[in-house]
Amino acid sequence: MAMHSEKQYLDLYQSSSRIIKKNSAEVLNAVRDAAFEDFRRLGFPSRKVERYKYTDMSAIFEPDYGLNLNRLEIPVDPYEAFRCDVPNLSTSLYFVVNDAFYNKALPKVELPEGVIVDSLSKIAAESPEFIGKYYAKIAKTDEDGITALNTFLAQDGLLIYVPKNVKVERTIQVINILRSDVDLMVNRRVLIVMEQGAEAKFLFCDHAADDKNFLATQVIEAFVGENASLDLYCLEETHYKNRRVSNVYIEQQANSRVNHNVITLHNGITRNR
């Protein structure tokens, strides 16, 4: 029998799956029901699971958070909300507000030809075969309850694509801003596809713009092709009311190189895997 923590999410999906699907892309929707069944079976990981030994996951997910299932636009000026300045680092700067790619403020400097940094659900709607090849392929929902939960609730997120042999010189910086007038749960998805010989550096910064209780789940899937090189730095500077659970999955081909670092400066509870 699912405890209260699980039950509210099972009930939520059963009552709202139509709304969730209506406001997302078919490729993301295609795996929801199976992920829901996996979550129903797995529930939240208990402390008996080695990698969750020190965190009471049920307690993190127990409070009643709001969710923006109807994709209402949340007013924010990201430039006012946050500066994530890293000295002497010149970046191409993008914003994700809660789980939605912010397309009103894009970097002035153009990326190399063919490189895409955009909304995951937008690209999934435009190129379903391409996204379908990668989405939810290495983030297995039958092995981790948190990944399953994220997969049946996530409606959007970020897609980064670097074509074959393209080297992105300038670091791509993505600032994830949590912004809400009520306590909010955010389920964000990130898909990174680096083709053969591609090279890029990413800096993801997590911030909270409001003094509210936030719960953010995030699943990152990174596919790194032969001889490709990926540097992924994740930096969190939120506040004590922030709960963050992030699972990272990386698939590497021959002679590829991945450097993944996570830095937590200020937070409430964070689980990075």
Regions flagged by a language model, labelled:
Residues 2-148:
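N-terminal amphipathic, basic helical "cap/leader" segment at the start of enzyme domains
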Residues 110-118, 126-273:
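Conserved beta-strand/loop scaffold segments within soluble protein domains that form the structured core
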